[in-house]
């Protein structure tokens, strides 16, 4: 049974190119079947706009599980965005709250933990 569910957000995806903690997390997930990494599609798109090719790169990593948006998710993320939450943060918040595995709880793994203050999700700070 998977014990650790972590949602990677846009800043964490962008940090893959040089942040040791993010790289170590990817490596750890490869070695540990109890850790599952999730990436919201919107976060991957947002990261690829900034760093072309990152979406293709993360799509090739076996330990990354992409999260699509269904209609209720689109509405929830859109509402958060209208409330001033950045798109990638909103997508990660929704993903952490609604993993496709029943009964699962997830943390958002991020290099920008302050973005999640007041969002009602747990955060795994990749700066430590």
Give the residues covered by each predicted segment.
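Active-site neighborhoods of divalent-metal-dependent phosphate/nucleic-acid chemistry enzymes
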Residues: 66-113
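Short, well-structured N-terminal submotif of metal-dependent ribonuclease cores
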Residues: 1-39, 49-60, 64
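Alpha-helical substrate-recognition element adjacent to the catalytic core
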Residues: 45-47
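Short, polar loop motifs at secondary-structure junctions
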Residues: 50-54, 109-115
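Histidine- and aromatic-rich ligand-binding microenvironments
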Residues: 8-9, 38-41, 85-86, 111, ...
């Amino acid at each position: 049974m998977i014990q650790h569910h972590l949602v990677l957000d846009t800043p964490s995806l962008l940090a893959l190119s040089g942040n040791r903690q993010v790289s170590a997390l990817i490596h750890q997930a490869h070695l540990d079947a109890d850790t599952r990494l999730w990436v919201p599609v919107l976060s991957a798109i947002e990261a690829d706009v900034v760093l072309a090719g990152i979406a293709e790169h993360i799509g090739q990593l076996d330990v990354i599980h992409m999260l699509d948006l269904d209609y209720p998710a689109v509405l929830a993320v859109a509402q958060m965005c209208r409330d001033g939450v950045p798109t990638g943060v909103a997508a990660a918040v929704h993903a952490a709250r609604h993993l496709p595995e029943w009964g699962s709880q997830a943390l958002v793994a991020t290099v920008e933990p302050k973005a999640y203050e007041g969002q009602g999700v747990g955060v795994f700070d990749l700066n430590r």
